[in-house]
Amino acid sequence: MIKIERQTKETDIVVELNVDGKGKSDIDTGIGFFDHMLESFAKHARFDVKVVCKGDIHVDFHHSVEDVGIVLGQAFYQSVFPVHNKERFGDAVIVMDESAVECAIDLSNRPFLVYEVDIDGTIGQFDAELIEEFFRAFVFNARITAHIIQKRGKNRHHLAEASFKALAVALRRALAEDKRAGMPSTKGVL
C-alpha cells in the first residue's frame, strides 16, 4: 500500500493505492461524477484505492480533478517501478451500450498520452474536458504511455466511463505477473 499526501493552496489530497488489491474503493472528492469514474477505475483495475480530496470546487472542478490525477499517478509509479516480472504492455476495448473505447498502454517510464475521445459539453455539472486533464495528469505522473481512443459512441457518460474502464483493464493486463519476463525490455532498464 502506497500513501501519498499533497497540499496546495487549491487542494488537499490523500491517496492510498494497492495495485495488488481486489477493486475496493473509498472515494470522496466532492465531485459525484468523478467519484463514480474513480470507483469504476478501481473496480476494473482490481486496485484498492482511497482518495480524499478537499478542493476549491466552489471555483471549478479543474484543480481537484487534475491534482487527483497527479497524486494517483505518483502512487502508481511508486507501486510499480521498477517494472519486473510483469507483462508491461496491456490493452482493452470496453463497450458501454453504443460506446466503445480502446486503451493500449506501455509501462514504459516514458510518459505520453494520446487521447482521441470526442466528448464536448458537460456530464451533469462535470465539464467533459476534465476527463482528458485527469488522464494527462495520471499518465505523466505514473510515467506510462497510454493511447485512449474512441471507436464509436455518442453518450458522454458512456464514453467517459468506457474510457476509465478501458484504462483500468489495460493496466491490470500490463501488471499481470510473468516470471519469465524479468526486466521486460531489451535495454535492460525501463
UniProtKB/Swiss-Prot annotation:
UniProt-recorded name of the protein: Imidazoleglycerol-phosphate dehydratase
Native organism: Nitratiruptor sp. (strain SB155-2)
Any one Pfam family match given in the protein's UniProt record, by short name: IGPD
Principal EC category: lyase
Gene (name only): hisB
GO biological process, one term: L-histidine biosynthetic process
Main subcellular location of this protein, as a coarse class: cytoplasm
Regions that span the bilayer: none
Family under the similarity heading: Belongs to the imidazoleglycerol-phosphate dehydratase family.
Pathway: Amino-acid biosynthesis; L-histidine biosynthesis; L-histidine from 5-phospho-alpha-D-ribose 1-diphosphate: step 6/9
